[in-house]
Amino acid sequence: MNSSSKELYFRMLRIRMVEEKIAELYSEQEMRCPVHLSIGQEAVAVGVCEHLDQKDIIMSAHRAHAHYLAKGGNLKSMLAELYGKATGCAMGKGGSMHLVDLNSGFFA
């Protein structure tokens, strides 16, 4: 819990910007899964994850993007997952609702 308010704000802003971009790109109908955005829930995810250690494991529900990113999940892997690519965090099989990052200790 060493982050400044400014750092926490920028983490929340990053998540919001990612979510807004996903919402924009989803209309192109190239993403292979329904998406469940976390817009409006960024502060909860960032606040909780601020108090966790790298070794802590968390699970989230179907609106997992914010928690995944706040816990340190890889953005490129998450986006690849939404597009159903084998390079996705669940090898393109989990979609938006089933994100996984073992290195970050995250499951949804």
What are these regions (language model features)?
Residues M1-L8:
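Charged, compositionally biased N-terminal leader segments and the immediate start
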Residues K6, E19-E20:
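A broad, low-specificity signal for short, low-complexity segments enriched in glycine/proline
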Residues E20-E24, E30-A108:
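Cofactor-binding active-site loop characterized by glycine-rich and histidine/acidic residues
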